Regions:
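Aromatic-lined substrate-binding rim segments of carbohydrate-active enzymes
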Residues: 75-172, 200, 237-254, 374-397
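N-terminal carbohydrate-binding accessory modules
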Residues: 25-99, 110-130, 137, 463-471
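Surface-exposed intrinsically disordered loops and tails
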Residues: 113-141, 178-185, 225-230, 274-288, ...
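Extracellular glycoside hydrolase catalytic/binding regions
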Residues: 79, 181, 191-208, 213-394
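Cellulosome-associated attachment modules in secreted, modular CAZymes
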Residues: 21-28, 470-532
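Sec-dependent N-terminal signal peptides of Gram-positive bacterial secreted proteins and lipoproteins
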Residues: 3-28
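Substrate-binding cleft of secreted/luminal carbohydrate-active enzymes
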Residues: 341-469
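Structural recognition of the beta-strand scaffold that forms the well-ordered cores
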Residues: 58-65, 96-102, 106, 160-167, ...
Length: 532
């Protein structure tokens, strides 16, 4: 990664009102000199990289911490431990982004200054800072005041925040509802909540992103409750709803990153959204299935269009392992390559390879202990996905910090008091660090925790690297022409040989140099990959 002297180029960057014109729109926040509350907004460049205001690439590597979405009115775990101490631990362990699940219902409660339905689940004896009196055993503050204290602490600790609209209604099983609206909270209510949230924090770049809706899903068994993705304006068309919501958000703050998740199913070739889920007489499947929020097949023909704000779009799939559900791609002997070929590529990885937009894996996680994962298959999947994200700089937020996620566990246990060092050791290589192992913040001023550095520290003191003259180099096996030879080249070549339209470098793909591209090249490439 190139390091650029911020001071040398700051004036030039600020003087320009738009960069990467056209499809990527403006990537510079303002023509005015930004203060420390406005200098950390992030944008997307033409290479589908998330960059800071100076054009420096960044890597969002965070975790999830839930509670606000389930009725606790605060992060879970604050019922026993001190909230500031837990946030400090998250920062010290190097997580530079916190994805916080919330609900439309909660945001509208705060907007209207309505009372908490119940006292927030806060231990007033271990959290005196969160009491009205500021003393041990005092009266617990209003939940929105507690939340704003958390925002302040995150800022000081170098943690950025992404709000996730996890569900319309506040409920422990709210994520089970497939759409962004219910009979109690409409699409218009969702818009209203998003607009209020955006306006309230438009001058605080601690909150850098909004995940518009967690895991839109649903199948054709109940068509009215199925999130779909097409060019219609139907009420359950997630693409249209996401574009409308993003437009409203970006009209208030054009600097927020907009995370758009996928859906669950997409019609197979020759079928459309009117097809039934399955023909049981012939056992014919009419839809491609995926994890909830993990299906972006529709984005190939109908990508999200944010107009002049396209530079704020990030696609955000979720991915889980066999302990959550035994998907077909978790067959015996599965590998990173087999999952890529059978699931990842067509559902979301193609978006990154084609530089349509960056990817942020909004949820990934699971058990790795012998009791829960005796055959190691879940750990194997986690390792495959982690390595994929490291190699391709896929942004991510691990699920989760909480110990009380029933099908995954968390980074802590023992009533939020002890870190799972084995699980953290698996995640740690995928956290953004410099060559000395220092964690890197997304904030230009504040370092991330006690073991990290600020973004300015990381990018300071280096002269800009001038581009060298482009030289086309033949790299045998580099089928996708990304200057590396790895399993993604094997996947691309396999698709090409199978007759699937695939953009490849034919010179590099001719692995055996016989002037033809075929199965023999694929065999030789796979032998090479196995050897090395």
């Amino acid at each position: 990664m190139k390091r650029i002297n911020l001071k040398r180029i700051a004036a030039a960057v600020i003087a320009v009102s738009s960069v990467f014109a056209g499809v990527y729109g403006s990537t510079v926040p303002s023509a005015a000199e930004p203060d420390e509350y406005h200098d950390d907004w992030l944008h997307v460049n033409e290479n589908a990289e998330i960059v800071d205001m100076y054009g420096n690439p960044v890597w969002l590597t965070g975790c999830n911490w839930f509670g606000y979405n389930v009725g606790s009115q605060v992060f879970d775990g604050v019922w026993s431990r001190n909230m500031h101490e837990m946030l400090t631990e998250i920062a010290d362990h190097g997580f530079n982004l916190l994805r916080v699940p919330m609900s439309t219902q909660l945001l509208l409660q705060w907007k209207n200054n309505e009372p908490d339905p119940a006292t927030p689940k806060i231990n007033e004896w271990t959290n005196p800072e969160l009491t009205v009196e500021g003393v041990v055993g005092g009266k617990v503050k209003y939940s929105f005041d507690v939340w704003n204290q958390a925002v302040k602490w995150c800022r000081e600790l170098g943690i950025k925040i992404m709000i996730d609209i996890h569900s319309a209604e506040t409920a422990s099983a709210g994520h089970q509802v497939s759409l962004w609206y219910t009979d109690k909270y409409s699409t218009e209510d969702w818009y209203e909540a998003l607009e209020w949230l955006t306006d309230y924090y438009k001058d605080d770049d601690t909150l850098i992103a909004i995940d518009l809706k967690n895991e839109p899903h649903g199948k054709a068994d109940v068509p009215s409750q199925m999130a779909k993705w097409d060019d219609s304006k139907d009420p359950n068309n997630w693409k249209y709803a996401a574009e409308c919501a993003a437009e409203k958000v970006l009209a208030i703050n054009a600097n927020l990153l907009i995370m758009v998740e996928g859906i669950e199913v997409y019609p197979k070739e020759g079928y459309d959204w009117t097809a039934p889920a399955k023909d049981w007489t012939t056992n014919t499947e009419f839809y491609y299935g995926a994890w909830w929020g993990g299906n972006f097949r529709g984005a190939k023909e109908n990508p999200i269009d944010l107009g002049e704000h396209q530079s704020q779009l990030v696609y955000s799939p979720h991915d889980y392992g066999p302990l959550v559900y035994e998907q077909s791609w978790f067959h015996e002997g599965f590998t990173q390559e087999s999952i890529m070929e059978e699931y990842w590529y067509d559902n979301w990885f193609y978006l990154l390879e084609e530089k349509t937009a960056p990817l942020l894996m909004g949820e990934w996680g699971g058990f790795i202990d012998e009791q829960h994962d005796p055959d190691g298959s879940n750990t194997k999947w986690l390792t495959c996905l982690r390595d994929l994200m490291i190699e391709n700089r896929i942004h991510h937020t691990f699920w989760c910090f909480n110990e009380n996620s029933g099908d995954t566990g968390g980074l802590v246990y023992d009533n939020f008091g002890t870190w799972d060092e084995d699980k953290y050791a698996l995640v740690k290589p995928a956290l953004w660090k410099d060559e000395n192992g220092k964690f890197i913040s997304l904030d230009h001023k504040f370092a991330i925790g006690a073991n990290g550095i600020s973004l300015s520290d990381y990018y300071s003191g280096q002269q800009p690297t001038l581009p060298s003259e482009s030289i086309d180099t033949l790299i045998k096996g580099d089928v996708n022409n990304d200057k590396k030879v790895n399993i993604f080249d094997s996947v691309a070549l396999k698709r090409f040989v199978a007759g699937i339209e695939t953009d490849i470098d034919k010179n590099n793909a001719d692995f055996n140099s016989d002037g033809n591209i075929g199965i023999s090249d694929l065999i030789q490439l796979n032998k090479f990959l196995i050897k090395y």
